[in-house]
Every structure is written in C-alpha cells, then in structure tokens.
Regions:
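Mature catalytic core of soluble alpha/beta enzymes
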Residues: 2-349
C-alpha cells in the first residue's frame, strides 16, 4: 500500500493544482454554491466539483457511473465485457452493450487515424512490460529495479505480432478477436469516454458549471460563474511539488495529458516508460516528456495524447493541424514548452 500511495502523490498534487488554479483566478460571490467530492476508481483518485448546487446526488450518480463502466470496460475485472471478449479470442463472438461497442468502435477509429500508433489490442504487450505493478512495488525513490524485469527482445517481438486492431471483428453488437493470442485493452481511452458520459449526464441535469477530473483527464463543464475561463495546470514532469509547468485557460473543454512520468521504472539509470511504440514493442524513444491535448471530447484527448506522443512533435503537429477544434502542448526533455496555437493562453507564470 505504501508503494501505491507513492505513485498517487502526483495525482493528488494535480488535483490540488487544478483546484488551486481555479480558486486563485476566480472572485466568487460569497453566496455561490459549490459541492466537491473525491473517490477512488480506475486505480486512481478522481474528483468532481460542481458549482451552483450543494446537492451531492449528482456527484454520487457520476461515481456510480464510474463503477458501472469500470466493471464493464476493465480488462482486469474478470467479469467485464472486455474480459469476456479476451477469454473468447479466436473462438467466438461475445455480445456486448451499446456502450462497450461504442468505445471499441472509437478505438478502431483512432487506430485508423493514427495509422496503428494507437492500438487497443496492445494488452498482451502491456502485460509483458508490467509497468504498473513493477513501479508500484519498488522501494527505490527513482523506481530503480533489477535488469531481470525487462522482457527479452524475443518475448517483445512475440507479443508485438499479436497487436493489430484490424483483428477485431464486429457484427451488430457481437465482437470477436480473430487472433487467439490478442488482448483488448481499452485503458488508453476509457477514462476519457467515461468523463464524456459524466459530462453529458450533468448537462442533462442542468448543471452548467463544474470540473470533472478522472486522474489527469480534466473535463470542464461550461464556464466559471463570472463567464471567464477555467485555469488548468499542466503537471511538471517528474516533479512532486505540485507546481505546474504551465497553465491553460479553457471553458467547456477537455484537457488530457500523457506523460512518461506516469508509469515507469529504471534499470541502471535507463528509463523505461509505459507509452509503447506499436512498431517496435519498446517504449517510445523521442525528446518528449509529455503531450497535452485540448479538445471538446475527453475520449479524443485520451487517444490523441498517446498518438501524438508516439508520433513525435513534427508528425504530431501535422495530425493536430488536420483536425478541427484540437490543440496540443508538448513538454520536451529539457522542459521546453511547444504549442500548436496560442488560443488557450498557455502561461508559465
């Protein structure tokens, strides 16, 4: 438990950064109503804050949604629909709910958009590297581990050969993996998908102002009570002080970051991180520490942040410029900040 808490520290600090930024930049009427709660889902701490109400029911309903979708979409929950698809790989179709089908179709769409750099059949390769468990169980401050934890090239190439989202077959609500050794993993887009569903629910209940934070997936509902933008902090990689490397100003937008500091370990000082290159099977090698995507949809932000990290700055910029309503912020390994536009007032002050 001690080691897991160590890796939750950046999440807690990120929550504090967002809340602090919002509080510091907003002059609120004394009578303004607000309710905020935290919960633990998806192996991380989530926080939902609503303005204009003190009714916790809306947040509790969102937490119920988190539990429902975790039980439906997680490949670590044995009875989930995704686990059933994996268990039946190469054998038979599995009938799934409309929500699971929607997310799988989105995953396939992102696979096409990224030319396979984002692939929801990466499950076995991710399991092989085992970043979450290894990083959580090390007592080293720098996540230094024994060289024996690094998989062999033969193992990596073997699992990589089963990473191909085109092996997903869909017939109505029936889904099958045609490769018996493939494994579906929706973790790269599930939190964004769930955040979008929560926002839609809140809007249906006439909630017009709030923040949904699912462990780094920040989705704002509407704008602040005075009509101004929210200020959201972008985490400084490998920093546990809580100070953001920069902030952005947004309203009714999603802010999602993928970074190598989220799950990693080191062997003899060499860093291995969880963002895997689907062309090599190894952690992506480039000069990036993190990529943040600002978009309308948190699900889009999830997929695009991973994709853009894998592509590298130049190709990622080309992709972002081809999309409508999407911008990116890149943090390089020398802590330089590169943006695709100045629309969201990126500030380091």
């Amino acid at each position: 438990m001690k080691n897991k808490l160590k890796h939750l520290v950046p999440v807690l600090l990120a929550l504090a950064t967002i809340t602090g930024s919002l509080s510091a930049c907003e002059l609120k009427p004394k009578a303004q109503q607000k309710v905020s709660k935290q919960g633990f889902y998806f192996d991380t701490i989530i926080q939902i804050t609503l303005y204009g109400t003190t009714d916790e029911k809306y947040i509790d309903d969102c937490f119920d949604m988190a539990k429902k979708y975790e039980d439906m979409l997680s490949n670590t929950v044995s009875y989930s629909e995704v686990s059933k698809i994996n268990d039946a790989a190469g054998k038979e179709y599995v009938t799934v709910s409309d929500d699971t089908l929607e997310l799988i179709k989105k995953g396939i769409e992102y696979g096409d958009t990224s030319d396979g750099r984002f692939d929801i059949t990466i499950g076995k390769l991710s399991d092989l590297w085992n970043f979450s468990e290894i990083a959580e169980n090390t007592d080293s401050k720098d996540n230094e581990v024994d060289a024996s934890v690094v998989p062999s090239d033969a193992q990596i190439q073997s699992e990589l050969s089963h990473v191909n989202y085109r092996n997903i077959q869909i017939n109505g609500n029936d889904v099958m993996l045609t490769d018996s050794k493939a494994k579906l993993d929706l973790g790269g887009i599930a939190k964004g998908f769930i955040a979008d569903k929560m926002k839609a629910y809140l809007q249906s209940k006439k909630i017009i102002s709030g923040i949904i934070n699912l462990g780094g997936n920040v989705l704002t509902v509407g704008e602040k009570s005075d009509g101004s933008d929210y200020t959201v902090g972008i985490q400084k990689p490998f920093d546990e002080s809580g100070e953001p490397i920069c902030t952005v100003k947004v309203k009714d937008k999603s802010v999602v970051t993928s970074g190598i500091y989220e799950r990693y370990y080191r062997v003899d000082g060499k860093l291995y991180h969880h963002i895997l290159d689907t062309t090599t099977g190894y952690p992506v090698k480039n000069n990036l520490y993190s990529v943040t995507i600002i978009s309308d949809s948190s699900c889009d932000g999830d997929a695009l942040s991973t994709t853009c990290f894998a592509l590298g700055i130049d190709k990622a910029k080309e992709l972002i410029n081809s999309l409508s309503g999407v911008e990116a912020i890149f943090v390089t390994d020398d802590y330089s900040i590169i943006t695709t536009s100045d629309e969201y007032n990126v500030s380091t002050e």
